[in-house]
């Protein structure tokens, strides 16, 4: 969802559920880790573009990502920079996850990895790096 809506909606749902902000809250983020930021970005763009356009846009999911002032969806670079997708090297993704945790209180993270859309060996390596390198540092 666009960042302009995040805090308000999180506060509304926390209040409605009788919980503290962030308590029991999870989020889904695309996660792709590769040897370079450029490789990870390309893997993400290739897989997320297909998945988004085929599986989410037809059902209206993109509307929540639109900038309320411009009506524009974030570019790939903006999505990564804002933490909507955790994409890059181990160091880049670790920094992104740490920044995301400072910004949004969450208890758990669902790692959307675009199974079958990312070449299998690269996907397995990405998951391995996330679980063995990123999570121990930023988890």
Where are these regions (language model features)?
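Active-site-adjacent structural elements that line small-molecule/cofactor binding pockets in enzymes
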Residues: 1-139
């Amino acid at each position: 969802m666009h960042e302009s809506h995040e805090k308000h909606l999180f506060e509304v749902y926390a209040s409605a559920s009788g919980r503290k902000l962030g308590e029991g809250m999870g989020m889904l983020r695309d996660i792709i880790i590769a040897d370079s930021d450029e490789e990870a970005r390309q893997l993400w763009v290739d897989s997320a573009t297909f998945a988004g356009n085929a599986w989410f846009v037809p059902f209206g999911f993109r509307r929540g990502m639109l900038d309320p002032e411009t009506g524009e969806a974030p570019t790939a670079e903006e999505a990564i920079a804002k933490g909507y997708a955790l994409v890059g090297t181990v160091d880049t993704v670790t920094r992104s996850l740490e920044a995301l945790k400072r910004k949004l209180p969450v208890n758990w993270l669902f790692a959307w990895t675009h199974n079958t859309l990312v070449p299998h060996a690269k996907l397995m390596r990405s998951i391995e790096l996330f679980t063995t390198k990123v999570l121990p540092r930023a988890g």
